[in-house]
Amino acid sequence: MVFLLLVLGMVLLMKGADLFVDGSASVARKLKVPSVIIGLTIVALGTSLPEASVSITAGLMGSNEIAISNIVGSNIFNTLVVVGTSAVITPFLMDKDILNRDLKINILVSILLSIFVLNGMLNRFEGMIFLVGLVLFILNLIRSAKKNRVEDEEVETLSGIKCLIYIVIGVACIIWGGDITVDSAKQIAAMLGMSDTLIGLTVVSIGTSLPELVTSVVAARKGESGLSLGNAIGSNIMNILFILGASSTIHPIAATSQNIFDTFVLIGVSLLIYGIAKKGDTMTRKKGIFMILVYVIYMIYIVVR
C-alpha cells in the first residue's frame, strides 16, 4: 500500500506541475508577456516544482536528509542519465551558450552548495544568497534571449476561469503530492531499513526527475537531443538556486556527513560532463553509455555504503 501511495504522490506532483504551468503560462500570455520570457521563467520553474514540493515539505517535516539528497540525487540523475540517454538515442552537437555559460554556472552553484553545507547546516542567509543568484541567473537568461528574439506565435490561451482552476488544482496537487511522497518515502525507508539519505538519492530523486527524462527522450526521438542538455543543466541550476534557496530560507536544513560527501560527487559529475562536452563538438553514443554506466556505479556504491 505504501508503495502505491509513493506512486500516487509522484503522479500528483507531475500532474500538478503540468496544470500550474499551463494555467500560469496562459495568464502570462493574456498579459502580453513574451513567450521567451514565459519559457525561461514559468515553465523552467514549473519543471522543478516536484523537487521543490518534496524538499520544502521534507524540510518542514524535519526530514532534512530527504530535502538535500532529493536535490543532489536529481541533479546527478539529470546530468548522467537524462543527458546520457538522449545521446544514446540520438547523438547531438554541443550548444556554445550551454558550454560557455550554463555548464560553468552549474559547476559554480554545485561548489557553492558543497561549501555551504560543510558546517552541517544550510541556513537562511545562505538560502537567500541562492535566491539572489536565481534572480541574476534568470535576468541573464532573459537578456541573452532578447538578443536572439523571434516573433511570438499566436498560441491558444485558456479562459480566465480555466486559468484559475488550473492554477488552484495544480498548486493543491503539488502540495498534497509532496506531502504523500515524503511521508510514504519515510515509511518505505523504515520498512526496508534504508536511511532517509538513500531513499532520497534513489527512489525520490529519480521519481521527481521523470518529467525531465520523459521530455528529453521525446525530444531525442524527434531529433532534438540537443535540447536535453540545456533542459537538464538548467534544471540542475534551478534545483539548487530556487529549491534549496527557498527551502533553507523558509526553514534551515541540517546536512549529514553523507549529504556533504554526495555534494562532492555532484561537483565531480558536473566537472565530468563539462570535460566530456569540451572534448569534441558531439555528444556521442559512447559518451552517453559511459555517463549511464557512471550513474549505475554510483547507485551500487550508495546502496552498499
Cite the ranges covered by each PLM segment.
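Hydrophobic alpha-helical segments, chiefly the membrane-spanning helices
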Residues: 1-305
